[in-house]
Swiss-Prot record:
The active site is at D52 (nucleophile). One of its GO terms (molecular function) is tRNA pseudouridine(38-40) synthase activity. InterPro entries: PsdUridine_synth_cat_dom_sf, PsdUridine_synth_TruA, PsdUridine_synth_TruA_a/b_dom, PsdUridine_synth_TruA_C, TruA/RsuA/RluB/E/F_N. Belongs to the tRNA pseudouridine synthase TruA family. Coiled coil: none annotated. CDD domains: PseudoU_synth_EcTruA. This is tRNA pseudouridine synthase A. It catalyses: uridine(38/39/40) in tRNA = pseudouridine(38/39/40) in tRNA. Formation of pseudouridine at positions 38, 39 and 40 in the anticodon stem and loop of transfer RNAs. Its EC number is 5.4.99.12. The keyword Nucleotide-binding does not apply. Substrate binds at Y113. It comes from Chlamydia felis (strain Fe/C-56) (Chlamydophila felis). SUPFAM superfamilies: Pseudouridine synthase.
Length: 268
């Protein structure tokens, strides 16, 4: 039995998210259909996480397990064959083989999401699919002050939408950076895991601070309430991307130096 691991990127605009849906097209459905054509049998794929409708990915990781197949000794052939039949908005970046102890979701030690804001009411044509225009001045200094209250380990129940069951709503944010590139502002959010719509709700709270709906320190009160009822509105999905998933050795095929667990602890 082999476990095949995929590194993939996709533009989520045309899809109802990662997970299969009864009446809508999903990334998972397209990937599984392509694999069935390549391997000649039904395939079920598990991902590192279920991105929502409209959300993109640069570094999504997924895996599937099947009895030996001649192609399993040629992972780059699998990559080439999949990319030949997948639509242009889904790309397999790499394929590797693993032992069956690896799991795309449960082996992950951290994820990094990126959210893009634009200062332009009429962004460049391709930016409208990947960046959100908030219709007010983006005040980086205020957003950075609010972001510092979210770093570290907290109960993020106020930032989680209903719809998922969790044994705990406690998560750790290692990084919450706001990078100003003039026209585009990028919010980089890295943590050991994320609740349903947590990143979009964090961005929503920072945007409320930016338009001075409340002061940066109010983030502490939102956290303390531990209730979504008083939480911030979610930012739109189309500007969010799953950028990277970190795994420990020996499963760090796609990792950067920042994925080392010791460096993650230092950032915390």
């Amino acid at each position: 039995m082999k476990r095949v691991v995929l590194l993939l990127a996709y533009q989520g605009t045309a899809y109802a998210g990662w997970q299969r849906q009864p009446n809508d097209l999903s990334i998972q459905e397209v990937i599984e259909s392509a694999l069935a054509r390549v391997l000649g049998k039904p395939i079920v794929v598990s991902s590192s996480g279920r991105t929502d409708s409209g959300v993109h990915a640069y570094g999504q990781v997924a895996h599937f397990s099947q009895p030996d197949h001649p192609l399993f000794s040629q992972p780059q052939s699998i990559k080439k064959m999949l990319n030949a039949i997948l639509p242009k908005d889904i790309v397999i970046r790499d394929v590797v083989l693993s032992d069956v102890n690896f799991h795309a979701r449960f082996s992950a030690i951290a994820k990094e999401y990126r959210y893009s804001l634009t200062r332009s009411p009429k962004p460049l044509p391709w930016q409208r699919y990947f960046a959100y225009y908030p219709r007010h001045s983006i005040k980086i200094d205020l957003m950075q002050k609010g972001a510092k209250y979210l770093l570290g380990t907290h109960d993020f129940a106020s930032f989680a939408n209903h719809g998922r069951d969790y044994t705990s709503t406690e998560r750790t944010l290692f990084k919450l950076d706001i990078i100003d590139n003039e026209e585009i502002v990028t919010i980089i959010c890295k943590g050991n895991g994320f609740l349903y719509k947590m990143v979009r709700n964090i961005v929503g709270s920072l945007l409320d601070i930016s338009k001075e709906k409340y002061p940066p320190e109010y983030i502490q009160e939102i956290l303390a309430q531990k209730s979504r009822r008083k939480g911030p509105p979610a930012a739109p999905s189309h500007a969010l991307s799953l950028h990277h998933v970190c795994y420990p050795k020996p499963y760090n095929w796609f990792c950067t130096p920042e994925c080392d667990i010791n460096s993650l602890k230092e950032e915390k």
